[in-house]
C-alpha cells in the first residue's frame, strides 16, 4: 500500500482509487464522489450497504454545490450551516437529481461537512472537489486510530494511506438535518 502526503494523492483518487486518511477524530476511507466504481469498491472494502449513504467532506462549501440542491434550503438554513463550518458539524442537505445513489443511498439528501482538519482540507484542495468520507473500519467495528491499524486492516484492499495526524477531536461530528434543524447525532 502506498503511503503518501495529501498533495501526492490526486492521481490515485481521480483514477478510481480508495484511500485511507486521517480526519478530525479517526481515520477515514475516501474516494472520488463522481466515480461509481470507486464508491462501490469503498463500500465493498467497508462491507457497508449502499442504502445507508455516505458523507462528502470538503475544504469549502463551493466544492459541494454540484451535489447539494441549495434551492430547497432557505437563506437562514444555509447561514446556520455556514456558521458552524469549518468544523465538526455534518449537515444533511437535499441532493441534486444527478447525484449517485451510491452516495445518498435510499435518501433524497446527502450528509456534507466542511472540515477544519488541515490534512482533509489539503486533500480536497488538491482534488478540487469533495471527497467521499466514511470511517475506516468494517461496518459495526471500531474505526482505525493509527496508520498501523490501517495497514493491518486494509493492506491489499485500498490503494493508499495518506500520511498525517489525527485531529484532537475524540467524538464523531454532530449531524444536523439542514431542513428541519433537528440534531440526528450529538457529537462534539
Curated annotation (Swiss-Prot):
A cellular component annotation (GO) from this entry: cytoplasm
Stored PROSITE patterns: YRDC
Subcellular location: Cytoplasm
Keyword annotations of the record: ATP-binding, Cytoplasm, Nucleotide-binding, Nucleotidyltransferase, Transferase, tRNA processing
Organism domain of life: Bacteria
Catalytic activity: L-threonine + hydrogencarbonate + ATP = L-threonylcarbamoyladenylate + diphosphate + H2O
E.C. designation(s): 2.7.7.87
InterPro entries for the chain: DHBP_synth_RibB-like_a/b_dom, Sua5-like_dom, TC-AMP_synthase, TC-AMP_synthase_SUA5
Domain YrdC-like: start-end pairs: 3-188
Similarity section: Belongs to the SUA5 family. TsaC subfamily.
Protein name: Threonylcarbamoyl-AMP synthase
Organism of this sequence: Shewanella sp. (strain MR-4)
Primary gene name: tsaC
Amino acid at each position: 500500500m502506498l503511503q503518501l502526503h495529501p498533495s501526492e494523492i490526486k492521481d490515485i483518487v481521480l483514477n478510481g482509487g480508495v484511500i485511507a486518511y486521517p480526519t478530525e477524530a479517526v481515520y477515514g476511507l475516501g474516494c472520488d464522489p463522481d466515480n461509481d466504481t470507486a464508491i462501490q469498491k469503498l463500500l465493498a472494502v467497508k462491507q457497508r450497504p449502499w442504502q445507508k449513504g455516505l458523507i462528502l467532506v470538503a475544504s469549502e462549501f463551493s466544492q459541494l454545490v454540484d451535489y447539494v440542491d441549495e434551492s430547497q434550503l432557505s437563506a437562514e438554513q444555509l447561514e446556520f450551516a455556514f456558521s458552524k463550518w469549518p468544523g465538526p458539524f455534518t449537515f444533511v442537505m437535499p441532493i441534486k437529481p444527478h447525484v449517485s445513489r451510491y452516495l445518498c443511498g435510499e435518501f433524497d439528501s446527502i450528509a456534507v461537512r466542511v472540515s477544519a482538519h488541515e490534512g482533509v482540507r489539503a486533500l480536497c484542495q488538491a482534488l478540487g472537489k469533495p471527497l467521499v468520507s466514511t470511517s475506516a473500519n468494517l461496518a459495526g467495528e471500531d474505526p482505525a486510530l493509527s496508520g498501523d491499524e490501517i495497514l493491518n486492516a486494509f493492506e491489499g484492499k485500498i490503494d493508499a494511506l495518506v500520511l498525517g495526524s489525527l485531529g484532537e477531536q475524540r467524538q464523531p461530528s454532530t449531524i444536523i438535518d439542514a431542513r428541519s434543524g433537528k440534531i440526528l447525532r450529538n457529537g462534539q
